[in-house]
Amino acid sequence: MKTAIVTSKSSLNHNTGSGHPESISRVTSILEKLKKNKKLIWKNPTSFDKDIIKQAHSSSYLDAVENAFPEKGLVFLDGDTVVSPGSKDATFDAVGSIISAIDGVENK
């Protein structure tokens, strides 16, 4: 069985501030360790039409998410979720990563 890692550089722009479990330093450390495993396949997120997201979420929810990202600084969406200006691209690349992973399993 082959294992793929689907990621993009945008994940390094999802700044959640110091002390948060999704910190950039933690993501960087994990990626560096994974890169030592030569058996892994590295893939980029798939580009997608936002209508795909609307199959699972309402247009109003998608609009709320898109408008939640600050131009500067950090914003808490709830007690656990922190976003920064770089989080928007990271969020949509995460969706593309899921699509790419599913396509990989389905051998597309």
Locate the predicted segments by residue.
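HDAC/HDAC-like amidohydrolase catalytic core signature
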Residues: M1-K108
